Amino acid sequence: MDTCVFPLVVLWISMRITSTLDEVPIGGIFDSRSVQALTAFRHEIHMFNRAYSHVYRYKLKNDTTILDVTDSFAVSNALCHHLSRGDLAIFGVSNASSLATIQSYTDTFNVPFVTISMAQNNSHNGSYQIYMRPMYINALVDVIVHYRWEKVAFYYDSDEGLVRLQQLFQATNKYDKMIISIDTKRITSVENGYHMLKELHLMDPEMEHRVLLDVRTDKAEQIILKVMNDSKINNAKFHFLLGDLGMLEINTTHFKIGGVNITGFQLVDPFNSTSELFISTWSSLDPVYWPGAGTNHVNYEAALAADSVRLFKSAFGSILQKDPNFLRRSRSGTAGKSMKCTDDSEIKTGHGQMILEEMKKVKFEGVTGHVAFNEQGHRKDFTLGVYNVAMTRGTAKIGYWNEREGKLHAHNPRLFQNNSSDMNRTRIVTTIIKEPYVMVNNVIRDGKPLVGNEPVEGFCIDLTKAVAEKVGFDFVIQFVKDGSYGSVLSNGTWDGIVGELIRHEADMAIAPFTITADRSRVIDFTKPFMSLGISIMIKRPQPAGKHFFSFMEPLSSEIWMCIVFAYIGVSVVLFLVSRFSPNEWHLSEAHHSYIANDFSISNSLWFSLGAFMQQGCDISPRSMSGRIVGSVWWFFTLIIISSYTANLAAFLTVERMLTPIDSAEDLARQTEIQYGTIMSGSTKAFFKNSQFQTYQRMWAYMTSAQPSVFVKTHEEGIQRVRQSNGKYAYLTESSTIDYVSNRKPCDTLKVGSNLNSDGFGIGTPVGSDLRDKLNFSVLELRENGDLAKWEKIWFDRGECPQHSSNKEGAQSALTLANVAGIFYILIGGLVVAVLSAAFEFLYKSRMDSRKSRMSFGSALRTKARLSFKGHIDSEQKTTGNGTRRRSHNSVTYTYTGPTNVMGGSHAFEDSNTHTEV
C-alpha cells in the first residue's frame, strides 16, 4: 500500500509546484511560410517549460499569430492582440514593409520585438527591436573584392533585396582603388530568373558572369539547377554568390558534375557542439506534432528562432536575479494593465526598457554561434563560414568572415582555380617521418631539399609507389613543414598535414594518418589501408625476481601456515586417540611382560610427516579412530601434493611480469604514473571529444598536469617512456606500439586492449580528381593481399625474445635459481642431522660415564671406537644392571626393563612404548 501512495504524493507535490509557477506571457508573429522557424520557436519554449521552469521559478506562456507578413494591416491587428495580452516581448518575422509598422507599435508601447528577419539601417538607440539575423553586407563585399570581381550582376526578388542593394552600394564606396559595377534586375519567379540568366549568357557566351543571387536558398538552388540543365548554357562561365545565409541547405551533389561554381555563407556551423545538439534533437522530433522537424536539415531561420527564445530566457533570468519581485511588481503597476491600440491614453509598459537593455547585454553560444548585440540591437562578434562548390569538388569550407575583425580569412585564395591541363602533373605527396611507415637514410636526414624518392623507405612509401603505378602519376615526397598531423587552431584554420591539403600545398597525404570525423569535414579520405586503435605504451617491467624459495610459490603463505598447523593438529589428535583406544595397546615383542603403544607423540609426528611426504612408515594405526585420522590425513595430503605438483612446473619454468596497469581505467584511477599523447593529432582529439567518463577524466588530468604530459613528436613520447623508469605511459596507435616493443632495446610494452577502433587512410583535398582512383587502388591492394604482405615485411621484424605479460608467461628452462632453496634445505637438514648426532653422541657418552663410574674422556673414546669400528676389541666391564655377552667379534648389551606386573595401578607407568631405550 505504501509503495502506491508514495508516487501519488510525489505527483501531487510536483503538480502543486507546477501550478504555482509564475507565467510570463510572450507573443509570436510568424509568416505562414516560416514553418521551421515557428516549430523551433514553439519547441524551444516547450523544452524550457519542461526542463528549466522549476529552476527559474517561472514558465513561458506564448500566443502565436500566423499570417502573411507582407500584409501590414494583419500585422497591426496581431500587434494589438499581443499588446492587449500584456506580452512582455514579441518574437517573429518581418519584411521591409511591415517592419516600419512593427517599429511604430513597439516603440510607442515600449515592448521589445525580437525578429529573425533582416536588419534595417534606420535603427537607432531608442528602437525596441532586437535583430537575431546579422548584417553581413560587408562580408558580401569582401568576397567580391577577394575574387576581384569588377562587374557583378545583382538579382533580387523582394523589397529586402532593394535594401541590401542600397547597403551594397554604400559598402563598396570604401574601396576607392577598385571600381565595382553592379547591374541589378528583379526576378519574379524561378522560371523568370532562369530566363534572365540565359539571356545574360547568350548575349556574350565567352564572357564570365559573376552573379549575386539575393533570393532564398531554396529558390536559388532551383534557378541554378535550371541553368545547369540547359545544354545551351556553358555552366563554367557562371560563378554564383548566394546572398542568403544557408549555403549548406542546398543539395550540392547536383552541382559537382555540372561545372557551376557556387560560393555562399553559412550562419549555422554544423560542427559546433551547440548546433550539433540542436540538430540531433530536431531530427528526433515527430513531424506530425512538430511540422518541419524530424530531419537533419535545419534552415538558419529555425536556428535564429531557437536562439531568440534562449536570448529572452537568459535576459529574464538575469532580471529575476537582480529583482526577485519583478513579476509581482509588473502585475501590480501600470505594466499590469491591458494596453489597447485604440486607447487615447498613452499606457506604456514599465518593464520594456529593462528587458530590452538586459537582452542587449546577454552573451552566449547559441545554435547560430556567438550571440551578442550592440546598442542598436544588431548582432556583433559573429562569424560566417564561407563555402564553395565547384566542378569535381564537393562542398568545401574555404574560409570565414568575422564581424569583429571585419575581414575575410581565406584558407586558399587559389582554391577555385580548376585547370584541366594540369591533371597529369607530378603530384606532391605529403607525409611525416615515423617508423616503420616512413623512414629516411642518414644521407638526407639533415638535408632540407629532397632529391628524388629513393632515400625514403617504409610501409607508406611502398603504398605510395603501388597506388602511383595503378593510378598512373609521378610523385615527389614532401615532409610536412610543421611536423604535425593536423588540428584546428583557435582561428578556425588547420595546421599540419590537414592544413597543407586544405591549402592545396600537397595533392595527397600518405602517412600514418588517422581518419577522423573532424578531418573528414575539411578533406577527403580513401578507405582505410590499415586498421588499428589507440593503446597504452609503458616501460617493460622487470620480471618478478627469483628467490631461493621459489618452490614455495605454488601455494600462498597462508596455505603453508595452515598445512603446518594441520600437521601438528593431526599428530596431536592421532596421539590422543591412540592413547584412549584399547586396540592400540599391545604386548611388547621384546618383553612380553610389558604392554606398549606405538604412537607416542614423536611417532605420531613421524607418521604424519611420512604421510605428507608420500613416504611409508613402520607403524600404522590399528584402531578405527586412528585409521580414520590417518585416512583423512592421507586424503588431505593427496589433494595438497597434487595441487602443488600441478602448479610447481608453471611457477618454476614460466617467467612472469607484473605490470602496474592493465587498462585505461587503471590509468585514470591513479596519479603516480603520468600519461599523455602527442601534441597534435587524432589521439589527442579522441580524448578531447570523448563522451566516455573514463576518457573525460583522463583528458582533464592531461590538460592540467604539470609539467605537460604532451609530447611534440612520436620519438619524444617513446624516449619519455624509456627514461621515466615506469612513471610515464604514452598513448598512441597500437600498431606503432607493437613495432617499437619488438625492436631493440626491447624495453617497452603494450598493455590492455585498444581504446577505440581507427584506421589510416590516404587524405586528399576535397573534390580531388584522384580521390576515387586512390580509393579503388587501396581496395584492390587489400583484396590482393599486398597490404598484408607489406605489413608483415615492415612490422614483423622482431628483434626481441618472447616476453611474458602479466597474464601469460613465456616458458623457459629450469635454472639453479629456481630450485636453489631445495638444495639449501637439503644442506641445512644434513647439517642439523650431523649436529644432532654429535649432541646425542656427547650426551650418551656423558650418561654412560656416570653410570660406569669412568671418566668422560674414556667413555667418549669407547663410544668413538664403537662408532668407527662397529665393535669393541677388548673386554669391557659392565656396571649397573647390564650383563655382558662376549662373542668373537662383538659385544652385545642387554638391558632389562622395570619388573612391574600387569594388574596394578602403576602397570603402565614408564612403559608406553618399546622405543624408550
Swiss-Prot record:
Gene3D superfamilies: 1.10.287.70, 3.40.50.2300, Periplasmic binding protein-like II. The chain crosses the membrane at residues 557-577, 632-652, 819-839. GO terms for molecular function: ligand-gated monoatomic ion channel activity; signaling receptor activity. Keywords: Cell membrane, Glycoprotein, Ion channel, Ion transport, Ligand-gated ion channel, Membrane, Postsynaptic cell membrane, Receptor, Signal, Synapse, Transmembrane, Transmembrane helix, Transport. Residues 1-19 form the signal peptide. Glycans are attached at residues 62, 95, 121, 125, 229, 251, 261, 272, 418-419, 424, 491, 775. Residues 871-896 are annotated as: Disordered. Residues 20-556, 653-818 are extracellular. It is a multi-pass membrane protein. The keyword Membrane applies. It is found in: Cell membrane; Postsynaptic cell membrane. SUPFAM superfamilies: Periplasmic binding protein-like I (SSF53822), Periplasmic binding protein-like II (SSF53850), Voltage-gated potassium channels (SSF81324). InterPro entries: ANF_lig-bd_rcpt (IPR001828), Glu/Gly-bd (IPR019594), Iono_Glu_rcpt_met (IPR001508), Ionotropic_Glu_rcpt (IPR015683), Iontro_rcpt_C (IPR001320), Peripla_BP_I (IPR028082). Belongs to the glutamate-gated ion channel (TC 1.A.10.1) family. Receptor for glutamate. L-glutamate acts as an excitatory neurotransmitter at many synapses in the central nervous system. The postsynaptic actions of Glu are mediated by a variety of receptors. This is Glutamate receptor.
